[in-house]
């Protein structure tokens, strides 16, 4: 089980409270598909992913980005039990979708980049980043649990 300090909880919940999941989710998934094009193989049914403009304008990418952020909200609401919260999701991504677990870290990094761009130094300082990346590392670990 992960131990969260009061400062970490405050930073994570404070950042989450400012995030617009309808904005950050689509941006982060689009960024992941553009920067790491091999991740596109999991989204063959999403239609045109042939260029950055096509990816950024793709409604299925945007919808799945919002779904991802909805999943993160579950982790936010269950910060003391993320592994159990994500148990079924880990099984699905491992056994049904066969997603390479390294991709979870790549997407988490893209979420971090998008949040940092949105809020800049004033809203995403080193202390916030440290707590946020710890939180996302816990989420990634929980998603990878079935792979071990």
Swiss-Prot record:
Where on this chain does heme b bind?
64, 93
One Gene Ontology molecular-function label: heme binding
Which SUPFAM superfamilies does its entry note?
Answer: Globin-like (SSF46458)
Residues of the Globin domain: 3-148
- What UniProt keywords are attached to this protein's entry? Heme, Iron, Metal-binding, Oxygen transport, Transport
Top-rank taxon, per record: Eukaryota
**Classification via PANTHER family:** HEMOGLOBIN FAMILY MEMBER, HEMOGLOBIN SUBUNIT BETA-1-RELATED
Instruction: Give the record's family classification.
Output: Belongs to the globin family.
Protein name (database record): Hemoglobin subunit beta-1
Record organism = Danio rerio
Its organism's taxonomic lineage begins at: Eukaryota, Metazoa, Chordata, Craniata, Vertebrata
- Gene that codes for this? ba1
